[in-house]
A protein has these predicted regions:
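Active-site SXXK
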Residues: 112-135, 191-196, 315
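Bacterial N-terminal signal peptides that target proteins for export
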Residues: 1-10
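Bacterial signal peptide processing site
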Residues: 22-26
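A short, well-structured edge-of-sheet supersecondary motif
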Residues: 67-114, 286, 307-311, 315-322
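Structured C-terminal helix/loop/strand segments within mature extracytoplasmic catalytic/sensor domains
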Residues: 60-69, 294-352
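Active-site-adjacent helix/loop patches that line small-molecule binding or acyl-intermediate pockets
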Residues: 64-72, 137-249, 257
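Active-site Gly/Thr loop motif
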Residues: 259-320
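C-terminal motif of bacterial Sec signal peptides marking the signal peptidase cleavage site
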Residues: 18-20
Length: 352
């Protein structure tokens, strides 16, 4: 074989090998898709900072001067108070009297002595509480919240003893139908006193017994536990001061053992002198908790208009002292309405 022939044979063989290996002018396969690049998450827009809400400044506590001015304004200007003028009023706490005043024509003053009628009831309740060391018996409660059934009391005579008063006319009559039901009256306390060591006492003896136990200086014009005291606003205020100061056991019993009093809304009530209010009665005192008009104060209004009270929180006491020319239970109720206006003005430090 010539050189030319060898060269051609070699080229032919190389071409065949290249074709067999997929080399000559053909494609080597599809181009792979590029790896996707992740889209970055959007940067969150920051929320604006909340606008701070300013804390309201605390309401300043009224000063004693502000409270006194407000109470004086109510005493002289509130319609309920104008209706019962003239009178003397005072408000205090455990430290003593804080404010007072007299309104109306020829009004009484702090030292004016007067009959206080049913304001005597709180005094006897306090006496029994003190004698019992603050732990009343069930029998005590039965008499002192006026559900005992002794409901025919009329009056005592000045020269009687507790026992002879209790036996006088219908005073000691027991009405079985009223037992367990509220009936406002003096027979409950007179019977209780007669049965508990006070039977032989006349006015002076009764005053001595009550005052020795309570640290007070009351006088009695008749031996009636529920209505026989005559005294001044100053003397009664001192008694109330001892209550709110925690010196008398009755303080812890204010509002204790309450009974409903309004016959229109309570089947266990026969008679209440406060028409139109659903208050309660406790140990010788009212709880002024009528849902519509009550403020929860504890009080013992008297028939001639003398009205002592202790605030619901037992921190403040007050007296409205007057002596109506015509006695009647509604005089006490009228004073109670005025007393509420004075009490509210004192608490708020403003009137109206």
């Amino acid at each position: 074989m010539t050189d030319r022939a060898r060269t051609l044979a070699t080229l032919t063989l190389l071409s065949s090998l290249v074709a067999a290996c997929g080399g000559g002018g053909g494609s080597s396969g599809p181009t792979p898709a590029p790896t996707p690049v992740p889209t970055p998450a959007p940067t969150p827009t920051p929320s604006p900072a909340p606008t701070p809400v300013p804390t309201p400044a605390p309401t300043p506590t009224p000063t004693v001067a502000q409270r006194t001015a407000a109470a004086a304004g109510a005493a002289s200007g509130a319609a309920d108070c104008v209706a019962v003028q003239p009178f003397y009023w005072s408000v205090g706490d455990a430290t003593g009297k804080l404010g007072d005043g007299s309104v109306g024509a020829a009004p009484p003053v702090a030292s004016t002595v007067m009959a206080i009628a049913s304001a005597s009831k709180l005094v006897y309740g306090a006496y029994v509480a003190e004698e019992r060391g603050g732990a009343l018996t069930d029998t005590d409660v039965h008499y002192l919240n006026f559900v005992s059934g002794y409901t025919d009391f009329d009056a005592c005579l000045q020269d009687q003893t507790v026992a002879t008063c209790e036996a006088y006319e219908s005073n000691g009559t027991y009405e079985a139908a009223n037992d367990g039901k509220f009936y406002y009256g003096g027979g409950h306390m007179e019977k209780h006193a007669d049965d508990n060591g006070l039977a032989a006492l006349d006015n002076a003896g009764l005053a001595a017994a009550i005052n020795t136990t309570l640290g007070t200086s009351f006088d009695y014009s008749q031996p009636q536990l529920a209505g026989g005291i005559y005294t001044s606003a100053t003397t009664y205020g001192g008694f109330l001061q001892r209550i709110v100061g925690g010196q008398l056991k009755i303080g812890a019993l204010l509002g204790a053992h309450p009974v409903c009093t309004q016959p229109a809304t309570c089947a266990a009530a026969v008679y209440s002198p406060i028409p139109g209010e659903a208050d309660h009665y406790s140990i010788g005192h009212w709880v002024e908790d009528d849902p519509a008009v009550g403020d929860g104060a504890f009080s013992s209004p008297g028939a001639f208009g003398f009205y002592p009270w202790v605030s619901h929180d037992k921190a403040t006491w007050g007296v409205l002292a007057r002596s109506a020319k015509v006695s009647g239970e509604q005089e006490g109720v009228a004073s109670m309405l005025c007393g509420r206006r004075i009490r509210a003005a004192w608490a708020a430090g403003q009137y109206p």
